[in-house]
Design a protein with these regions (language model features):
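Ferredoxin-type iron-sulfur electron-transfer modules in oxidoreductases and energy-metabolism complexes
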Residues: 3, 17-39, 56-81, 138-155, ...
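Conserved phosphate/anionic-ligand binding catalytic regions in large, soluble enzymes, centered on
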Residues: 12-13, 47, 136, 155-177, ...
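Short acidic, glycine/serine/threonine-rich loops at helix termini
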Residues: 16-18, 48-53, 166-174, 198-201, ...
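Fe-S ferredoxin-like electron-transfer domains
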Residues: 59-157, 285, 295-310, 441, ...
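Hydrophobic alpha-helical positions that pack around
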Residues: 112, 240-374, 386
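Accessory "access/gating" subregions that flank catalytic or transport cores
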Residues: 141-181, 341-346, 351, 359, ...
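Histidine-anchored nucleotide/phosphate-binding helix
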Residues: 208-222
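Short amphipathic, charge-patterned alpha-helical segments
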Residues: 215-219, 373-391
Length: 529
């Protein structure tokens, strides 16, 4: 029997991976070829999707992108056999731009440093046995009986910062919740991934859900919480099914419920589907939504670590952060020497340790997921994602999501350091690691107005700077674009942005200055002509 791997990731399905899987299965039945069709997550290099992999005694081979018209040729070339070794007649395939080879030689993967995405695309997402065989649960089994202070100290040593956008040190949140004198504490995983150009949370939830669940359980055991929640974006239908099934498997395996792994410690995880509002990705608005209230931002202090869900101490981290927890705390040699912790701390930059899961989309040849060390330059990342034959065809990149800054594509910004401190120095944010590349067909005036319209629509309305400021900036911007009192209106726009940055209750208002100021600074000639 030949193992045949095809992704059922949401993005892969949108590229007809499901239809290709059905056609291959039917053709195998017709030819009486015994194949084992295995659905996986996606490697995240979407120009190759639908990607078909076969595994035999010679290894794993990939072919993609496969179209319906290629299916018969694949079978005629005996791809689905034990003797296939990667050599076959490519005459019919090269015309369609099909690539093939051993998965170990897949260059877009080989050059990455995949720590938390190492299983995505390789193993069936809901196979707990495969997860365990690949090192999963080693972190949980190790820390379940360790002193909580030691666990938090190891997270501190690793240098892990939250991957939700703000980059706040993870250990501080956990330590604060641990020290709070409360019988009831909560763990919340923020899976309300709403930024444009961000899709890593969804991909790992669909492709390796056990790594997230393990990280959440570790957090609960460490700080003394009994209940955890995954707050999932309402549009993530496939991820919802995957998470619910994974939670059932964990319950049946004794990883959730009473006496986890016979330790005497209890912890449960529930899934909550979000209300669909962009601002619910902000941690306090998310908590309000979880309490069946309107998703509006809370005043701080107190922070959620002191008064969070139902006013109880709450650890609130995003999906990728919990995945890094599972990685960092596993593979120990003894209590004080952790191979993964040491490696994580050794890569990246001084203030941005480890890897970042960059999500590259737009005008690139190979859009997708690139898990690379913090501090990689923009040029290195763009080259890895396919490169460009003509730099002049590119106009801009936006880094950090909808509220991230726009940068021109030139020699100065090709050397941009992709880290928290590197983006800060250039007046930008790293955010969730989303990078959208624009060519010269993009209308940046339209992008500016669309950003302002989005902020107006998505403001929760609680604070005046955001509610009124975004509307006022749009009015003034429209005047500027009509060449009405340009200097005076630009000055007022700057004053309002400064007010919003200092007085808004959340990032929706406080970070609006990043896209607006960067567009006006770096693309002034286009915006004002």
């Amino acid at each position: 029997m030949i193992n045949t791997y095809i992704s059922d990731d949401t993005s892969s399905l949108s590229l007809f991976a499901g239809e290709i899987a059905d056609l291959i299965f039917k053709e195998a039945l017709n030819r009486k070829i015994d194949i084992n069709l295995i659905r996986t997550g996606s490697y995240g290099i979407f120009n190759y999707e639908p990607l078909v992999e076969i595994e035999n005694k010679n290894g794993r081979f990939f072919i993609g992108p496969v179209k319906e018209s290629n299916i018969i040729d694949l079978f005629n070339n005996n791809i689905f056999s034990e003797n296939f070794n990667g050599d076959f007649n490519l005459k019919n395939f090269n015309k369609n731009g099909i690539f093939y080879g051993k998965i170990d030689d897949f260059q877009e993967l080989k050059k990455q440093k995949r720590l938390i995405f190492k299983r995505v695309g390789i193993n069936p997402p809901l196979s707990l046995d495969d997860y365990i065989n690949d090192g999963g649960l080693s972190a949980l089994k190790r820390v379940i009986n360790l002193d909580s202070a030691l666990v938090i100290d190891e997270i501190k040593i690793s240098g892990l910062r939250g991957r939700g956008g703000a980059g706040f040190p993870v250990w501080i949140k956990w330590d604060t919740v641990l020290k709070e004198k409360s019988e009831t504490k909560y763990i919340v995983c923020n899976a309300d991934e709403g930024d444009s150009g961000a899709f890593a949370d969804r991909m790992i939830l669909e492709g390796d859900p056990f790594s997230i669940i393990e990280g959440i359980i570790i957090a609960g055991i460490t700080v003394g919480a009994k209940n955890g929640y995954i707050y999932l974006r309402s549009e993530y239908f496939n991820a919802k099914k995957r998470i619910l099934k994974a939670l059932d498997i964990c319950n049946d395996a004794g990883l959730l419920g009473n006496s986890i792994l016979n330790s005497g410690k209890s912890f449960n995880i529930s899934l909550i589907v979000g209300g669909g509002s962009y601002v619910c990705g902000e941690e306090t608005a998310l908590l309000e939504s979880m309490e069946n209230k309107r998703g509006m931002v809370r005043m701080r202090p107190p922070v959620p670590a002191i008064s969070g869900l139902y006013n109880k101490p709450t650890v609130l981290n995003n999906v990728l952060t919990f995945a890094y927890i599972s990685y960092i705390l596993s593979s120990c040699n003894n209590i004080t020497q952790l191979a993964n912790l040491d490696y994580f701390n050794s890569i990246g930059t001084k203030d941005s340790k480890g890897t970042m899961v960059f999500q590259v989309s737009g005008a690139v040849k190979h859009p997708g997921i690139y898990e690379m060390p913090m501090g990689i330059t923009l040029k290195e990342l763009l080259d890895l994602s396919g490169g460009f034959s003509d730099k002049r065809s590119l106009k801009a990149v936006q880094i950090g999501g909808l509220l991230g800054a726009y940068f021109p594509v030139n020699d100065e910004f090709f050397n941009l350091n992709l880290s928290y401190e590197g983006l800060t120095q250039k007046g930008g944010i790293l955010g969730h690691g989303g990078i959208v590349v624009f060519d010269e067909s993009i209308d940046l005036k339209h992008m500016l107005l669309r950003t302002l319209e989005f902020c107006i629509d998505e403001s929760c309305g609680k604070c005046s700077p955001c509610r009124l400021g975004s509307m006022r900036i749009k009015e003034l911007t429209e005047r500027v674009l009509k060449k009405q009192n340009i200097d005076a209106n630009l000055e007022i726009i700057g004053e309002i942005l400064n007010t919003m940055e200092g007085l808004s209750l959340c990032g929706l208002g406080a970070m609006l200055h990043y896209p607006v100021n960067s567009l006006l600074k770096y693309f002034n000639k286009e915006i004002l002509t």
